[in-house]
Each structure stands twice: as structure tokens, then as C-alpha cells.
Swiss-Prot record:
One of its GO terms (biological process) is protein polyubiquitination. The keyword Magnesium does not apply. LRR repeats lie at residues 113-135, 279-305, 398-420. It comes from the Eukaryota. PANTHER family: RNI-LIKE SUPERFAMILY PROTEIN. It comes from Arabidopsis thaliana. Residues 1-46 form the F-box domain. It holds the Pfam family F-box. CDD domains: F-box_AtFBL13-like (cd22160). Keywords: Leucine-rich repeat, Repeat. The lineage of its organism: Eukaryota, Viridiplantae, Streptophyta, Embryophyta, Tracheophyta. This is Putative F-box/LRR-repeat protein At3g42770. One of its GO terms (molecular function) is ubiquitin protein ligase activity. The keyword Transmembrane helix does not apply.
Length: 532
């Protein structure tokens, strides 16, 4: 690591909690002030409380933490702060907790912080500093607490805020509406309310929000709270709640994607018809297994037509799925892609498939190879005449012999069309299309899976650094060369591979290692391997 330039070392330190980054100042004279150059600060007193609570009393632990944060912020001088993260748990008898936290927050804001993440657990009702709501630099804001009540000032203005995450934050009704109005650039809003929370914002109104996630985990007073979704620009909606008597009015003009996770309560008056009507223009819809049950039991009116729905992800873990799926196929005349999961949970007894369905691609998730699953797939490939592709994702773990047998069973199924293509696939939920820089420090993983699954899922990856403790040992592991060869073979666009050997390795071993590395098979003749 000493061979790396200061700029890269500072970037690496920025990924660490500030406590760990500060400890590197003991390594050498060069490292003494490197941590102060990091634009990211991450403080967490819960780790300190857990590690020292048997040796020190709580008051001394908290005093030590306060002194550490104050001294670290003082070292910033006039340098800017990009990200400030604070996890703070107030201890009994701490009378200055709120004062200390508010001082640190204001200090970060004065240094032009653009990302502010607060997770605060007070023992009493407290308020956040009003300066949070008048920052012109904030781009991301996360507020997580159980007892903070924001006081929104009249001069509220957050012109740069794009991402807002609220967990158990309680606003007065008009205050939250004023809050959103003061965020003209807001694109991503997440609201999470726990059972102990007092309530939710009544109205969510914004013309700029593109991604909206609302989760309400309290089954009591379910009709208290949300009254309006006035978010016409939303392209991705996640809504998790208990079934209600009356749902908020939804202004979602052209919703491309939505996920519904509605949970059942033993309430005969509950009704989800209004909710379904509010998202009837959606193009891609995911219904969880609990939502499937709720729709069947709590839809008092006629289910609206989903004229624009093209992609449907449907969970069949409840017995009632076979009654709802045919109905959905009828009310979704333009549905072309159907994804089903949990089909091994219930016996297949057959159901009616609408003759006019237009489903062209069917995906079966978590396939176990059971008799009931095979019968269901057989029914689909016979009755769905428009089917072109059936993708069956086998459940993991599963040995190669069983996968081969499942594949043979599926390919033998009679089909409505000879052109139908059945594919048996191993699932991968990993996809990071925008990832450019990746640094791993002592992370243990399956190298074969990492090379075959992870790297193909990162098409934009440009800078990859890996630090594995075994590489630093004097006695080299037998598997190291095998691991490195995976990188040199699987990363086709790799241009430079630098191997930093242990400082204790003598010159003879370095020469031997260099020869072995240069013999490794590579995916490109342009790849340069350097031993540092």
C-alpha cells in the first residue's frame, strides 16, 4: 500500500469509518495526516459503547466519543466535507446529547456537506437544527430517529436536494407539504414508518419525484396518515402497507413500474379496489404473495383493466393464486412478459387460461423440479399459444446432475408451438451497470462465482483493487495464482494487473513469483502484469 499515491490512499480511507481511518495515522510519518484529507466523515458511537461498556462507565465513553468528533472536525480547518454520517445513541444521564449532535450537524453544514446521513436515538423528545432545512449544498439527506420532531422554518429552502430518506420522522401535516415544496430538484423519496411511529405525512405532493418508496409497518390505525399521492412524474413506485378501508388518492399519470406489498388484516371492511384503480396505467407490476391474497379477499369492486401492463411479476406462494392469475390475464390484454415464483408451494389442479392472452415470454423463478411445478409448466406451454420463450431459473444450490435431469424433463414437454424455446438458467440478481470503481479489503468470496457472475454484471468497471490478507503473508497461499488467473482470464478489457507482494518477501521469491505470473493465461495480448 505504501507504493500507492496519496490520492488513491485518501480515496481508500474515505470508504472507512472515521475511527478506523484515524487509526492509520500510527502507521508512519506519511500516514499521520492522510486521514484528514478524506472528504467523508463517518461517526458511530454504538460501536464504542459495545466494545468498552464493561471497562468504562457510559458517561466516560460518551465523553471520549464527543472529544473524538470535536477534534476530528477541528482538523478539517477550511476544507470542505462531502459526506457526513452520524450514528448516535444517547445514554441515560447524558444531558448534552442533543446539543453535541446539533453542533456537529451545523459544523458539517458550514463545511458545505452535500450528503448528510443521521441515525439518532434520543432518550427524550428532541428537535433537529433548523439549518438542515436551509442548506443550498445538500444533495442527499437521510434522517432516521425515534424521537426527533423537525421544526420546519418559514425560510426553508433545499434547492439542490435530490435524494431524501425519512425513517420514523414525524411532521405536522402542513410542514411536510411545505418541506416538499422547498425541494424543487427532489427525485428520490423514501418514507419508512415503524409501528411505534406517531404517524405519516398526510400528503405526498411533488412534480419532480421520479422514485417513490413508502413503507408503513403498523397494522393499527391503518387509515390514519396518507391521503394523497400527487406525484405525476414517478417512474418507480414501491408501496408497502396493511390493507386499508380507504386508500390515498393517486395522481400517477403514466407510471412505468410499481411494486405492491400489501399485508392482510382480519377486517371485512378493507378494500383495495381504489388502490388498484390508482395504478391502472402501470407498465411493469410486481405483486408479492401477500398482495395476491389481499386482492382476492379484499377487492370489493370490479378490478380495473390494466391496458398498459406489459410485464407482470406474480408470486404464487398462496393457494389463491390460481384464481387470480386467470383474471389478471383477462384484464391485461397487452401483457407480453409473465414472471412467476413460488409455484412449488401448492398442488396444481388446473385453471382456465384466456384464449386471447398475448404472453410471449414466461419466466419461472426458484424452480425445484417438483411434480406440481412440472405439471404447471406443461400446462402453460400447451395453452399459451403465443409463447415464444420460457425461461426456467433453477433454485440454488443444486448439483449439476440434478440440473441436467431437470433440463431433460422440461425439454420433453409437449408444446403448442414447435418454435417455443425452453431455457434452463442459473439465477443471478447481481447487476451493477454504473459501477466504475471497486475496492475490496479482506472480503472473502467464491472466486469462481466472483469471476463468472460478478464481473459480467459490472460492464462499466474501470478501476478494481483487491486487498486480501493471505497475500500479505510470507508463505504464499497455493490458491493465489489460481485466483489471479481468474481475473486475467475473465476481465477481457483488463489492461494492467498490479500484484503487490508482501514486504517480507525476499528478491529470490519475487523473481520466482514474477515468472509464474507472466506464465498465466490472459484474455488479451495487451494485458501488462506488474509485480510491485
Amino acid at each position: 500500500m505504501n507504493c500507492l499515491p496519496d490520492e488513491l490512499l485518501v480515496q481508500i480511507l474515505s470508504f472507512l469509518p472515521t475511527k478506523e481511518a484515524t487509526s492509520t495515522s500510527l502507521l508512519s510519518k506519511r500516514w499521520r495526516t492522510l486521514f484528514t484529507l478524506s472528504p467523508n466523515l463517518d461517526f458511530d458511537n454504538s460501536l464504542l459503547l459495545q466494545s468498552k461498556k464493561r471497562k468504562w462507565n457510559m458517561r466516560n465513553i460518551q465523553k471520549s466519543f464527543v472529544g473524538f468528533v470535536d477534534s476530528t472536525l477541528a482538523l478539517q480547518g477550511g476544507k470542505g466535507i462531502k459526506s457526513f454520517s452520524l450514528k448516535f445513541k444517547e445514554t441515560l444521564g447524558d444531558v448534552n446529547g442533543e446539543v453535541d449532535v446539533n453542533r456537529w450537524i451545523c459544523n458539517a453544514l458550514e463545511h458545505g456537506v452535500s450528503e448528510l446521513h443521521l441515525r439518532i436515538d434520543y432518550t427524550k423528545r428532541c428537535h433537529l437544527p433548523s439549518e438542515i432545512f436551509t442548506s443550498t449544498k445538500l444533495v442527499k439527506l437521510s434522517l432516521v430517529t425515534q424521537s426527533c420532531f423537525p421544526v420546519v422554518p418559514n425560510c426553508i429552502s433545499l434547492p439542490s436536494l435530490k435524494v431524501l430518506f425519512l425513517d420514523s420522522i414525524w411532521f405536522e401535516v402542513p410542514q411536510f407539504l411545505i418541506f416538499l415544496t422547498a425541494c424543487p430538484a427532489l427525485e428520490d423519496l423514501t418514507i419508512y414508518q415503524k409501528p411505534h411511529s406517531v404517524g405519516m405525512p398526510y400528503h405526498i405532493s411533488s412534480k419532480t419525484i421520479k422514485r417513490l418508496s413508502v413503507t408503513y409497518t403498523c397494522g393499527y390505525f391503518v387509515d390514519y396518515g396518507l391521503k394523497l399521492f400527487n406525484t405525476p412524474s414517478v417512474v418507480d413506485l414501491y408501496y408497502s402497507d396493511y390493507v386499508r378501508h380507504k386508500y390515498p388518492h393517486m395522481n400517477l399519470d403514466s407510471l412505468p413500474k410499481a411494486t405492491l406489498d400489501i399485508h392482510f388484516l382480519d377486517d371485512n371492511a378493507a378494500n383495495v379496489t381504489e388502490l388498484l384503480s390508482g395504478i391502472r396505467n402501470v407498465k411493469t407490476l410486481h405483486l408479492t404473495s401477500s398482495t395476491v391474497k389481499v386482492i382476492l379477499l379484499c377487492c370489493k369492486g370490479e378490478i380495473p383493466m390494466f391496458e398498459n401492463l406489459i410485464n407482470l411479476k406474480f408470486s404464487g406462494k398462496t393457494r389463491q393464486w390460481k384464481f387470480l392469475l386467470p383474471l389478471l390475464l383477462e384484464i391485461c390484454p397487452n401483457l407480453t412478459t409473465l414472471v412467476l415464483s413460488g409455484l412449488d408451494q401448492n398442488w396444481f389442479v388446473g385453471f382456465r387460461t384466456p384464449p386471447n392472452n398475448q404472453v410471449k415470454m414466461l419466466s419461472i423463478m426458484q424452480y425445484q423440479g417438483s411434480e406440481r411445478e412440472l405439471k404447471l409448466i406443461s400446462y402453460f406451454v400447451l395453452k399459451m399459444e403465443c409463447l415464444q420463450v420460457v425461461k426456467v431459473y433453477v433454485s440454488s444450490p443444486m448439483n449439476d446432475l440434478k440440473k441436467m435431469q431437470l433440463t431433460e424433463d422440461l425439454l420433453k414437454l409437449p408444446k403448442a408451438s414447435p418454435k417455443l424455446n425452453i431455457q434452463v438458467l442459473v439465477p443471478s440478481d447481481t447487476y451493477l451497470p454504473a459501477l466504475k470503481v471497486l475496492f475490496l479489503d479482506s472480503v472473502w468470496f467464491d472466486f469462481h462465482q466472483f469471476a463468472n457472475v460478478f464481473f459480467p454484471a459490472c460492464p462499466a468497471l474501470e478501476d478494481f483493487a483487491i486487498h486480501i490478507k493471505s497475500f500479505r503473508r510470507k508463505a504464499r497461499s497455493e490458491n493465489e495464482l489460481e485466483h489471479i488467473s481468474h481475473f486475467s482470464l475473465k476481465m477481457e478489457f483488463l489492461e494492467v494487473l498490479k500484484v503487490y507482494v508482501a514486504l517480507t518477501m525476499d528478491d529470490t521469491k519475487k523473481v520466482e513469483l514474477t515468472k509464474e505470473l507472466l506464465k498465466l493465461p490472459i484474455s488479451s495480448s495487451k494485458l501488462i502484469i506488474q509485480v510491485m
